[in-house]
Amino acid sequence: MKPFARRALLTAEPIRALLLAASLLAATLGLMPAEAFGASRIKDIADFEGVRDNMLVGYGLVVGLNSTGDSLTNAPFTKESLTGMLERLGVNIRDKTGAISSQLTPKNVAAVMITATLPPFSRQGTRIDINVSAMGDAKDLRGGTLLVTPLIGADGEVYAVGQGQVATGGFTASGASGSSVTKGVPTAGRIANGAIVERELPFEMSHLESVKVSLRNPDFTTSRRIAQAINSFLGGDMARPVDPGTVQIAVPPGYRGNVVGLLTDVEQLRVEPDQMARVVVDEVSGTIVMGENVRISTVAIAQGQLTIRITETPQVSQPSPFSDAGTTTTVQRTDIQVDEGAGNKLAVVPHKVTLQELVEGLNSLGIGPRDLITILQAIKAAGALQAELEVL
């Protein structure tokens, strides 16, 4: 009997260890505040003022195309650009009268626009990606090489210089009869690490006495919660909401000269953002997206021979007998009834219900998204939809 008893003991030990680990995990989750599960980091819902990207643009030429470039008769700017580039390189292509030679008709050159994004705190010598897009009637940029092109900012200064081979996501194939097949967009491409930063943006953070936090979705409640979270962390009245989209932080004495450390600590704080009740519908694709706080007031709906009645009945929920925790609360029981017969009268809805409950009732009948969009627009027109309806 003893060997069997020892085997049973060895089998029970891992089970006890798992139960103990599960108990510790449950206790740990129970100690965590409920807000932490729905909270987001400040860095995920806001930006720091001054820390942003900058747009760059440039004009250049792509060469080396396989007879898929611009036709110089239809794109005179390509001819002028090619002429100016060759003259700067010491190549004379003008006749005795000074006019551009009519024999200059290459098919492997295309005029393009270059766009790029300059990340914040980019230093000289770092590389950034650039996008290349055809301007003329070029059919395909695949295999072409972008010549040296300066990229300028909104202030007219050159911040980067781009050059390299263009990679496209499409292609064009044509036959002798004139028929062609195009896949993707062969007239737009990308050059990974195709530009070198030549000028840095002048921005110094160490001397700042205050920092502003810019919310990506401005909201009064969210900005106040961010200020409260920062003040709770710093232990003083250092942050205040200026408007729904801005929270101003005064740099504490302990962070003077170390603003980067302050922003590092602040962006890790968690805040539960508040959202405005909104319903977004896309009539083209039939997509419906709704927020959590969407509610419907008293309304009766009928579409053709379809009648929907929504009622809510309050019920009392009590904890089990001899329970140490729990309170008696009142909950709403929702009842959705749908009649498809003719001759039914509209029923008045006496209480507010969520839009999700209404949509679930309609979906159970197989009503398509486009009919749902029509119903939602009618509810909004009646003033019963307590949310913003945005139609794309």
UniProtKB/Swiss-Prot annotation:
Cysteine pairs bridged by disulfides in the record: none
Molecular function terms from GO: structural molecule activity
Keyword Cell cycle: no
Matching Pfam families: FlgI (PF02119)
Any GO CC annotation of this UniProt entry: bacterial-type flagellum basal body, distal rod, P ring
GO BP term (any one): bacterial-type flagellum-dependent cell motility
Domain of life: Bacteria
Signal peptide start and end residues: 1-38
InterPro entries: Flag_FlgI (IPR001782)
PANTHER family: FLAGELLAR P-RING PERIPLASMIC PROTEIN FLGI (PTHR30381), FLAGELLAR P-RING PROTEIN (PTHR30381:SF0)
Protein name listed in UniProt: Flagellar P-ring protein
